[in-house]
Amino acid sequence: MEVFMNIQKILELTDKTLDDCKIEISEIPNINLYMEQVLTFLNDELDEFKRDPKDKIYTKSMINNYVKSQVLSKPDNKKYTPNHVIELLLIFYMKQILSLDDIKILFDYSLANNNLREIYASYLNHTNNEYLNVSSEINNYINILQNDEELKNDETKTLILISLLTAKANAYKMFSEKLIDSLKKDNDK
């Protein structure tokens, strides 16, 4: 049970981290920023997502590559608008699961004719609810595994828990990719 108690603590910490890491629209600077300012803002605000303190969330090269590959819209006279920052936040959240090519297809389809601030506000609203669901679901898995008499030890329960979580993540990833593929097919017509 000790390992599962640690999982509870990790889950509580994750809940707090996810809650603390949401960057509200009001927190995004309402002025145009130079590259270094964008990097400082994003790396500071997304710091909780690092697994290793030495990691960088964003680098100058990464952002330049996003612009070059047209995933991120070009800066205006070397300055990045609040909308650029929102795009970079969405890229950060999505690139954990999707390829940059998939993100580009999605952005090309979705962002051109829509208000980016409204999209991001809606994203934040829905992810708040989703984080609550995820926490509840993981707690449910933990309870099921704790009560499963066929599972003999914590190591096995931990393996099964992680396997369930990755299976669900893979299913969501696959569904997201299929949706993007359908957007690409519609766009190619």
Model-derived features with residue positions:
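Basic helix-turn-helix/winged-helix DNA-binding cores
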Residues: 2-111
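Intrinsically disordered, low-complexity, charge-dense segments enriched in Lys/Arg
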Residues: 106-109, 113-189
